[in-house]
Amino acid sequence: MQLKGSKTHQALKDAFAGESQANRRYLYFAAKADVEGQNDIAAVFRSTAEGETGHAHGHLEYLESCGDPATNLPFGKSRDNLKSAIAGETHEYTDMYPGMAKTARAEGFAEIADWFETLAKAERSHANRFQKALDVLAD
């Protein structure tokens, strides 16, 4: 049976998303613990975040044969990774964040809408940086 399109493929994508989010949450929690002067707690969160990164990378190893879980584009080699990153960042600055900003503004969350609009600009910059790297990539 082929992995791509299977329930196991979806499980790997879901697991990758969950582990990735756990990593970022734990790093955020570690920063909060640092502010509170809870150095031991911060260290626990940081070391656990690193473990979650290992789990996420393991999922990506299996997903390489199926395509990037965010863009469905091939990934693994630098050229493919850059193309996938450009596609992901482009989606974020052209569709995702502008749509989120519009919704937030319509619901009366102007500050959050402004935040989303700021992020759209940052994502455009990221896409441009990846494009420049792709343009000079030697084969």
Predicted stretch roles:
Residues 1-139:
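Non-heme di-metal
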